[in-house]
């Protein structure tokens, strides 16, 4: 039980560090690589890595094969969560073309607030203590990410990144709904397979690879 609690703290912390540090790289590439191209190129290696990891875990921890209904559930979960994730990262990358990494980091992290707000419409109860922590987190993110110059005005890029936060919130709610029904690693793999499947069509139409290179 103790190891489980430590894992619940350490793994999200590592994820937050990786996710937060990526904003600078995304911002630098935003003026050179289109949002769909960027999404495709970051999702393909992630999908391949997760697929290999799933294969290794299945070999190390054999289990019964999925039933037809479980396969449908995994497919449905991957499509729903993957579509939301595709839209979220596309809006985020598009917004970074016209806003700073600091503002994008703050606005994207507003999904922390939106998850419990939207969750109430799906029957999720939220305690007052959680709302207090959310308020403190948002205030901290604001002072960390937004300085006086960045805080002036609300640009088209800011709106795009806010839509990203909304989509991230729904994606997290969807993952929470399905994660108890399917394997979490397989769901992650399915999501990252969906991203290039959707993004490459728009990339080929609006952002041909020759213009990226």
Protein language model regions, located:
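Glycine-/small-residue-enriched transmembrane alpha-helix faces in small-molecule transporters
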Residues: 1-37, 83, 91, 150-177, ...
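Hydrophobic/aromatic residues within transmembrane alpha-helices
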Residues: 29, 38, 42, 95, ...
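Structural signature of hydrophobic alpha-helical transmembrane segments
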Residues: 34-48, 93-111, 154-167, 213
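C-terminal transmembrane-helix exit sites in multi-pass transporters
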Residues: 49-54, 111-132
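Cytoplasmic-side transmembrane-helix entry/capping segments in multi-pass membrane proteins
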Residues: 73-80, 126-138, 157-161, 182-192
